[in-house]
A protein has these predicted regions:
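Basic helix-extension-helix modules of the SAP/HeH family
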Residues: 1-142, 152
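Interaction-mediating elements
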Residues: 149, 155-157
């Protein structure tokens, strides 16, 4: 989880800047958890840039991995717009958005709250796909394997061609 010192930050920072705060191993682990591969032989800055471009190019990598509550949280970020912090009660376990370094978090320990800020480029990448991801999660609550996703895509394709 990437923490910030106050809520004066604006959301016009880049995802690669968030990744640069992490170690190279942490970045590789994030991408591995999303069932993708990134070479561990790259320099840290290149690893951060490549990981950010993978997520921004295919936001469904992340959206398919989130549970329904976190997808609703992403929808809140999308609807809130730029420079808007989403406030949640602190939990023992961070959200996946925090674990994957997709938000910067200010920890208000007195109020026991997290003030989360999502970079504009991440919010804009998620925006066109969030409703589809929520509908998909309603239909298939558990995470699907690559084989199951392929079968669903094939069935959808066949159904469209038979109509």
């Amino acid at each position: 989880m990437i923490t910030i010192k106050n809520t004066d930050f604006q959301s016009n920072f880049r995802l690669s800047q968030l990744f640069n705060v992490l170690t190279k191993d942490e970045i590789v682990k994030i991408i591995t958890k999303l069932d993708e591969y990134i070479s561990p032989n790259l320099k840290k800055a290149d690893t951060a840039a490549r990981a950010a471009s993978m997520i921004l190019y295919d936001p469904m990598l992340v959206l398919e991995d989130l549970n329904k509550d976190e997808l609703k949280l992403v929808k809140e970020f999308v609807e809130a717009g730029a420079n808007q912090y989403i406030i949640r009660k602190q939990r023992k376990t961070p959200y996946k958005l925090q674990k994957y370094a997709l938000v910067a978090t200010y920890e208000d320990d007195k109020a026991a709250q997290w003030h989360m800020l999502m970079p504009d480029e991440v919010r804009e990448a998620f925006a066109p796909h969030i409703d589809e991801a929520l509908a998909f999660k309603e239909k298939f609550p558990k995470k699907l394997t690559h084989k199951e996703k392929s079968m669903i895509a094939l069935m959808d394709y066949l159904n469209r061609n038979n109509e």
